[in-house]
Amino acid sequence: GDGAHSLNISTAVALVVAACEVPVAKHGNRAASSKAGAADTLEALGLNLDRASAQAEASLTDLGICFLFAQKHHPALAPLAPIRKAIGRRTVFNLTGPLANPAGVTRQLIGVARPDFLPVYAEAIAALEYQAVMLVSGDEPLDELSVCGPSTCLTVGRPAERLAPEDFGLTRHAPEDLRGGDPAYNADALRRLLMGETGAYRDAVLLNAGAALVVAGHAHDVRDGIEEAAEALDRGLAKALLDCWIAY
């Protein structure tokens, strides 16, 4: 919901983190302010959205990952989908969506579309029953940790930090290197990533997966998390997980 029309970074991050044996409940929807949302891209990869959502609990138990299709879990909002699509830009639903995961998660990496929204999210998080949350916003703006420039990272109870890809040994990339397309385009890029393709997409996924592994208590710091995420990609664990998920 940041309007950057980038590749599906958080969807790829979910697969990589789950391949690191951290259970992930991915909550997403079809595109409203972009060309391809998480649901669109996963469907283009071959995931049956209705079945995946209906079997979410079993999938999370058996595979360590599930997809919670927002249209199925928040049916009262379904009639608004065409209106949001017609508006074509961020609405209040882009802001509240990350806080409405039906799985009731207690640890979460939350991407925020604009840095000035971070304090508002922090107030909301403080009122909810989370164990650990990291709020991140790229300067582009981008609702992820950015590999195209600096990002702001806010953990409740701690001062905000400024982070850059170079801080973690990653290359800085141009925003157009992460530009996405329609669901088929984004799905193809994600599959190539899982098959070992390097570049901006991989670096963006590694950085955000590294942060997610810290939030999960699975990595000591982001650098350690990046190393673990890279291993999950290089050993084909994330690709194998996607294949199992599609066949489940």
Residue ranges and their predicted role:
Residues 6, 43-50, 58-248:
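Glycine-rich anion-binding loops and their surrounding alpha/beta cores
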Residues 1-32:
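Active-site cofactor/substrate anionic-group-binding motifs, chiefly glycine-
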Residues 17-20, 34-37, 99-102, 168-170:
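A short alpha-helix capping/helix-coil boundary motif
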Residues 28, 51-53:
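Short beta->alpha connector loops at strand-helix junctions that form conserved
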Residues 30-48:
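Active-site-proximal loop->helix
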